[in-house]
């Protein structure tokens, strides 16, 4: 059995009594265009980019709440690049909170995505608090890492493990917008001295 996340191994062994000899870990790969050196995009602000599906499982509320907590930090721009069933609600939430620092770009073709990665000072990753989701490793993790970008994350389980092992960013528990805001501030203070993203 091929698994894309190590979190599935213990689940298969315990719940389905699959012997470890039958399980092979094969993580998802990043598209080649993200493994090449990204062109530099000159910018004055600090750009934090979330890329991908904007669904219930992605818990983008965590980003919006962190942005709300840090809205006095006017140099931070929070970019949401993607589409999904929760996008319109997130837009409405941002509007209600007066979060002009959040920019919704909508869905973009794959060939345009390197631009958004190049403009990013760090990438954002959030997931909801769910035991099944905590066993997964979203493909965007490999893509973020392949692009050499630091990851600021609020998710449980496998994602946290990978970020800590690779030393490629900061991770807090799913839904912890206060913790995410704290680490965004720390990233701002240390981004020129801590070599995150060199993975």
Stretch-by-stretch model annotation:
Residues 122-125, 143-154:
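Short hydrophobic beta-strand element within catalytic cores of glycosyltransferases
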Residues 45, 77-82, 88-114:
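Nucleotide-activated donor-binding/catalytic signature segment of Leloir-type glycosyltransferases, i.e.
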Residues 185-199:
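Conserved donor-nucleotide binding/catalytic region of nucleotide-linked donor-dependent transferases
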Residues 68, 88-89, 109-120, 145-146, ...:
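Short acidic alpha-helix that forms the nucleotide-activated donor recognition element
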Residues 125-134:
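Short Ser/Thr-rich beta->loop micro-motif in glycosyltransferases that lines
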């Amino acid at each position: 059995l091929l698994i894309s996340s190590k979190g599935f191994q213990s689940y298969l062994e315990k719940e389905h009594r699959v012997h470890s000899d039958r399980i092979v870990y094969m993580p998802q790969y990043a598209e080649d265009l993200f493994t090449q050196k990204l062109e530099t995009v000159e910018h004055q602000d600090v750009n934090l980019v979330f890329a991908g599906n904007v669904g219930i499982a992605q818990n983008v509320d965590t980003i919006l709440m962190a942005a709300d907590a840090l809205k006095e930090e006017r140099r931070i721009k929070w970019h949401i690049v993607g589409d999904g069933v929760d996008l319109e609600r997130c837009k409405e939430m941002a509007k209600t909170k007066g979060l002009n620092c959040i920019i919704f770009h909508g869905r973009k073709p794959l060939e345009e995505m390197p631009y958004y990665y190049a403009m990013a000072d760090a990438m954002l990753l959030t997931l909801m608090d769910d035991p099944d989701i905590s066993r997964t490793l979203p493909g965007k993790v490999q893509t973020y890492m392949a692009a050499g970008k630091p990851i600021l994350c609020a998710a449980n389980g496998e994602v946290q493990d990978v970020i800590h092992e690779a030393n490629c960013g900061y991770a807090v528990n799913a839904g912890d917008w206060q913790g995410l805001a704290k680490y965004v501030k720390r990233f701002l203070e240390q981004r020129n001295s801590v070599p995150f993203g060199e993975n």
